[in-house]
Amino acid sequence: MVKYGRKSRKRSISLWGVCFAVLSGCFFVCLVLWLTGYIPGMAEKQDSPQNTDTVVAEKTGSVWEVHCIDVGQASATLVIAGEHAMLADTGNKDDANMILTYLKEVGVDSLEYLFLTHPHEDHIGSAAAILREIPVERVLMPDISIDVCETVCYANLLAAIEEKESVVDYPVAGDTYEMGVFSFTIVCPSPEWVTDEKDLNESSLGIRISDGEHHILLYGDGKQYCENYMVAHQEIEADILIVGHHGSTYSSSQAFLEEVRPRYAVISCGKDNDYGFPHRLALRRLESVGAEIMRTDESGTIVFYFDGKNISF
């Protein structure tokens, strides 16, 4: 009896062992499936895949993009719409390699437009190098002779244009261009403006980019004259304002900002720059119209995505 009892107990232990092993295996398989998101209803509870999908969706769902590239105390803005790309200003001459690398990283190997607001080095510094390195379909720039702007940087740009036999337009206010899903209109300076070698800033070409739903305004180093002309003669309401003259107090007048009413105001400037940009008065005026101020010296490169309805960044 004792022997049978022991044998019977041994069989019972073996059966429980088998059951435990089977149950453990099932639990392990279910755990793996749950963690990898293969059990229906579980995948959306995993933080990492969900966050990754959201980021990708924002980028792949965008119809066009605006990249306010951090070029220190200078300016460079890249606009991408599918296979179309425009670069507005090109930073200083020492920024060429960085800008070319950035273009490559975001998949831009040619430009439909190279838009140059005015011939100061912090806006056209890398233009010659860019023209020599990648295909540029058309250059848009103010019609300023070398006699008015006698700088090595400007002479180098004109030489590169001649070497590459670039197509150059000298647009005036009111001219409109198409690019992908959007168009852009020249909004300053006045067609009657006569370039003054003492103040090339007021010769800055300004553009208003629009997809019909959202608008961006950019006008180089334009100051009071440019702003007054735009207020009087142009439609300038914009969701995003690339702030004039790096946030100088001589730009971004109250009357001008009241017309633009930007949701976002981007200031391209260098950290601890010698000019003290952005100036306190300009910041106060921007704040007074409810603009969210964004600065490249604090945030680095700033990218906006447009999906036809919304703006994300």
Question: How should these model regions be labeled?
Answer:
Residues 2-313:
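Non-globular, low-confidence helical/coil segments that flank catalytic cores
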